[in-house]
Amino acid sequence: MAGDKFAGITIKWDYANSRCRISMPGYIETLLIKFKHPRPSKPRLSPYKCLPISYGAKSQLTPEADESELLDEHRKRRIQEIVGSLLYYARAVDNKLLVALSAIAARQSCATVATEQAVHLLLDYVATYPADGIVY
């Protein structure tokens, strides 16, 4: 059917139920191959490592300052490329990634080993759910 793709986004119309599903099939698989990221051995269910909640505490603690080793320019550039690629995907069809991408993007200019680990966890998450999309 004509008009079922736009800017790399696949649009599947369900007129009978008045719904529309947008997705980007194959985008995540291509991204994982491009950045040579292996499939996770067990599913990653969250896009970002969160601080544990202290139930009953008067206040929640903020994360401690990242004092891990700084990355070289090549590894920092790789993080920037991954964040850019996933930002396009997240804004188009998978907005659950935006909070994690925002946190990583804020630290990518002075990327550390901890930032690289956060990107690795995010790639594990998208590898767990490669065919995600939005239904309107």
Regions found by a protein language model. Name each.
Residues 1-136:
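Long, low-complexity, charge-biased intrinsically disordered regions
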